[in-house]
């Protein structure tokens, strides 16, 4: 958003996945790193205001204590607390609650970014599918319930989100519409294959019809001080 020329760097329509998957593969090759998957932090080991590690729950439910001289506390997201979120539903801010329990200061927990365009789902237990803003950079348009444009699609995320919420309230609807038919079909299928496929699975043929969109919680910038 907030751009007047095409300047978004992306990999198809899965930029985030492309970056994180490459980083993850690089970390797995490091000889001094052990990765515990499907593992939850239950508590930290703390004495006299010093952290000595963490208590974790493995996938099979067993509890273990991991001792450490240094502990980096990466709290993760809070998307599971929202009706619509691009985050996984199990991200509910547990680490922030633990921080408060141990009297650890938090910072910027009011810094929550709402992405203006995700595919609208009535099932609130499902993770919201992000419709990349790069499609708007390529010419996609937004419409109200009467199929009238109501906003400049290239506004910054916060302003566009506000405009969409205002239109939804005005129309008494749960979503607005996005029209990707302004983008040539070959370009759609080449540049945004995952969006096209996901919408197809949801019963919408992107090259032929509009899709329902709703803003959703996306990034959480706060955490431990």
Feature-to-residue mapping (PLM):
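Conserved redox-cofactor binding core of oxidoreductases
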Residues: 1-62, 69-70, 74, 118-122, ...
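Short, solvent-exposed loop/turn segments at the edges of secondary structure
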Residues: 3, 75, 93, 135-138
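Catalytic cores of large soluble enzymes that bind and process phosphate-bearing ligands
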Residues: 11-19, 33, 46, 60, ...
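Short hydrophobic core segments
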Residues: 66-76, 99, 147
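Flavin (primarily FAD) binding-site architecture
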Residues: 73-87
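Thiamine diphosphate
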Residues: 87-100, 106
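An anion/pyrophosphate-binding glycine-rich loop and adjacent beta-alpha core
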Residues: 98, 104-219
């Amino acid at each position: 958003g907030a751009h007047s020329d095409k300047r978004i760097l992306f990999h198809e329509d899965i930029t985030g996945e492309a970056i994180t998957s490459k980083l993850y593969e690089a970390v797995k090759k490091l000889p001094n790193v052990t990765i515990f998957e499907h593992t939850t932090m239950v508590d930290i080991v703390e004495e006299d205001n010093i952290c000595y590690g963490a208590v974790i729950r493995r996938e099979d439910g067993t509890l273990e204590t991991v001792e450490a001289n240094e502990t980096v506390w990466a709290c993760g997201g809070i998307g599971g607390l929202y009706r619509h979120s691009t985050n996984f539903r199990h991200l509910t801010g547990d680490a922030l609650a633990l921080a408060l329990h141990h009297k650890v200061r938090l910072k910027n927990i009011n810094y929550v970014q709402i992405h203006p365009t995700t595919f609208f789902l009535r099932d609130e237990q499902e993770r919201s599918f992000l419709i990349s803003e790069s499609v708007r950079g390529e010419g996609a348009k937004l419409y109200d319930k009467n199929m009238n444009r109501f906003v400049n699609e290239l506004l910054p995320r916060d302003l566009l989100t506000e405009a969409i919420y205002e239109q939804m309230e005005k129309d008494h609807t749960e979503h607005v519409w996005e029209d990707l038919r302004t983008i040539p079909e070959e370009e759609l299928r080449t540049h945004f294959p995952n969006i096209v496929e996901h919408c197809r699975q949801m019963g919408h043929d992107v090259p032929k019809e509009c899709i329902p969109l709703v803003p959703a919680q996306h990034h959480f910038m706060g955490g431990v001080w």
